[in-house]
Each structure stands twice: as C-alpha cells, then as structure tokens.
Amino acid sequence: MLKIIIPTIMLLPTALLSPKASLWTNTTTYSLLIATISLQWLNPTYFPHKNMTPWTGIDQISAPLLVLSCWLLPLMLLASQNHLQQEPLVRKRTFIVTLTTIQPFIILAFSATELTLFYISFEATLIPTLILITRWGNQPERLSAGIYLLFYTLISSLPLLVTILHLHTQIGTLHMPTLELTHPLLTHSWTGTLSGLALLMAFMVKAPLYGLHLWLPKAHVEAPIAGSMLLAALLLKLGGYGIMRVTLLMGPLTDRLSYPFLALALWGALMTSSICLRQTDLKSLIAYSSVSHMGLVIAASMIQTDWSFSGAMILMISHGLTSSMLFCLANTNYERTHSRILLLTRGLQPLLPLMSVWWLLANLTNMALPPTTNLMAELTIMIALFNWSTPTIILTGLATLLTASYTLFMLSMTQRGTLPTHLTSIHNSNTREHLLMTLHIFPMLLLMLKPELISGVI
C-alpha cells in the first residue's frame, strides 16, 4: 500500500521543484510509473483481503478501482497540457499539485477498512475538486457549479457521519470486516431504516441517483478537462463503491429501504437517456449518459446478489474509461472550435480523420457493442435484475435502446454533416492526443480478453 501512496505524495515536490522545461515530462512519466506499479494489485488472490494494515486492505471490489484511480492521474496530466499553455509557471505547478493531492485521498477511500478513515478520505476529495472547478473552469457559472457540488455533497454526508458515530457507540468498532460479521442495522424498526437511509444517502448523491443528480451536469460542464475526467471516472465510482460496501455491512436490505432506490435508479436510467437525445451541449450529453450508466450500477448494488455486484463492478470500470475518453474527445473539439454546442462543431470528420476513428471507438464502447466489457456488464446487470423481478427487463431494455440511440446521435452530430462556415482554420490532431486516447482504449481492449480481473467476485 505504502509503495504506491508514498511515491504519489512525492509527486508534490516533483511538481514544485521540476524546471520549467521538464515539468510536464517529469510529472507525467513519474505518474505513469506509479500506474504501472499499481497493476500488481490486479493479481488474483485466494484471501479476502491482501496488503492488510490496521486501516487499509485490498479486496476484489477495491483492487480494480484502485488501479483505475492510479491509471487516470497521468492521463489527466496529459489532457491538461494544452489548456494550461498560456498560464504562468506558478499556476501550472499549483494545478499539478491540486490534481496530485486528490490521488492519495482516493486511494485511501478505496482501500480503507475503517469507516472513519473512509469517511474522512471520501470527504477530503471534495476540496481539491472544488478548487479545480472554481479556479480552472471556463465560464463564470463555475462558481454556481462549485456551490451546487459543495452543498449537495455536504448536506448528504452529515447524516452519514452521525450514523458512523452512532455505530461506534453501539458496537464499539468501525472495522469493516468486523461489522460485516455483526450486520448491525438489521432491525425492521423505523430507526433502523433511518440509519440505513443515512448511510446510503451520501453515496446516492455521489453516484448520483436520479433526482439527486443536479450538481453533476453543472460540475461537468464547468470543470476543466482534468476535472471532468476526475468526476466521471473516479468520484462517481466512490459513490458506487460506497453503496456496495455499506449494503454488505447492513446485510439484506428491507423492502422499504431498497425499493425506492431501485425504482428511482432504473427510472432515472431511462429518463436521463431520453434527456441525452435532446441535448445541445456535448459535455452535458456525456454527463447525463454518466447518470444513466450509474443508475444501472445503483440498481445492481441494491439487490445484493453476486451476479449484480459483479456486473456493477465491471460497469464502473468500463464506464470510467469510456466516459473519460469521451470527455477527452469533447475537449479536443472544444480546444479547436471554442464551442461545445453540437450544431456548431459538426462535420469534423474530413478535417480530423484520425480523431473520428477515436470518436467511433469511444462511442461503440459507450453503447456496449460486443465484445466490450460494457456489454458484459450490462448483460450481467440485466440478468441479475430480471432474476430479481421480471418487469425490470422493460426498463433496462429501453434504457439500453436509448443508450444506443443517443450514442449514435452524438457520433453523427460531431462527425457528419456540413462543416459550419465559421470554422476556417483548425489545428491538426497531435501525438499527445493520440497517446491519450490510446491509453484509454488499450485497457478496454485488454480487459475484453480477461474480464474476471475487474469482475469483483466477492
């Protein structure tokens, strides 16, 4: 554990002390090295927890998410180079330091076996994210987006803190493996239900559940590219991971606790997919598609079967890589045309032919084309939900159909059609961008060959 966390923390002096010429090279290479070392966590184990320290441990649910979080840091640095070109050196260093600060907190959140540490690191990721959005966002609305993010997250996580403290007074320990043996909140009383609700609510907002998702499109649209990648690929996964952890703690959920969440998640997957079909803003479209995918993850986590957990895990990892790649592609368009409106950025295929190949690949993985891991995840979740209740096949089937529709809509709008007249000169795509897309799609292609690495078998 420490052999990843300590090098990650040492990225801070690297960013602060590197000379101007080699600042990006040093930090990106160093973080790629950390990402490569973290791949050993995927090594299958016969023990439920490995690398155990008194506070942290890795099992098959957290290992894939930990590797994903290490893998994305160099990609965020690669993606941010262009839009920070005009900034003074001090601000570049500050930006890299802010990005790097989030990393140890995310690693701790995914590997904590102690609920207090989990809560602290879960909340600590909020501060650097807020700085990223409110300082490096593009429009003045970024302040409103930051306030939405802050208040949604804080209001939902205060009951979580109270319940964690209540658990500690009730049982005397907050060690997760111990709590899993006791199932502390199994009462059918209203207090038990309220405690369960308080535990779940913080993660439902983070995931986000439909109805509690209003902060997400705002935050995504206003954030810089690194902020969007961070939100889509890692912070939403913190919500999904928290739900899986907490539902394991609570044992079988009562009907009155799980039904509303299940109904909202599945209905939300349908509604947000429909919203995507009439979006004009590219980043907003990708943000709503994230809500739709995470709705399936929430629904799967709520029914608490091995198959559903496995499907939720695969979907979280696949969606992390896919949506991050889509945001990078949207950003490459934005940097050239200075617009996110789909009507103003259409018909780019003749001008950027190689980029349109990446667009095609990203969209095909997003709409769950076989044999991608997205398809395996969606099928597993659909089967688990169908097994739990037959009518859910209508909702999941429609959601899948709408996903394919809005993905093709996004592809045709950005790549096809006549080129708008105001686009007179567009820079060619460069090697850095192609490397960035390759590093997104390469893990996806490799995971197709061995999806059990991320299937999180409990």
From Swiss-Prot:
Report any one BP term from Gene Ontology.
electron transport coupled proton transport
Which reaction is catalysed here? a ubiquinone + NADH + 5 H(+)(in) = a ubiquinol + NAD(+) + 4 H(+)(out)
Q: Where in the cell is it found?
A: Mitochondrion membrane
What are the EC numbers?
7.1.1.2
Transmembrane parts of this sequence: 21-43, 58-78, 93-112, 116-138, 145-165, 196-216, 224-244, 257-277, 285-305, 309-329, 341-361, 379-399
Q: Does the keyword Glycoprotein apply?
A: no
Single GO molecular-function term?
NADH dehydrogenase (ubiquinone) activity
Recorded GO CC terms? mitochondrial membrane
Key words of the record: Electron transport, Membrane, Mitochondrion, NAD, Respiratory chain, Translocase, Transmembrane, Transmembrane helix, Transport, Ubiquinone
Domain of life of the organism encoding this protein: Eukaryota
What is the membrane topology noted in the UniProt record heading this document?
Multi-pass membrane protein
Q: Which NCBIfam families match?
A: NDH_I_M
* Family named by the database record: Belongs to the complex I subunit 4 family.
The entry's function note states:
Core subunit of the mitochondrial membrane respiratory chain NADH dehydrogenase (Complex I) that is believed to belong to the minimal assembly required for catalysis. Complex I functions in the transfer of electrons from NADH to the respiratory chain. The immediate electron acceptor for the enzyme is believed to be ubiquinone.
Name this polypeptide is given: NADH-ubiquinone oxidoreductase chain 4
Species per Swiss-Prot/TrEMBL record: Struthio camelus
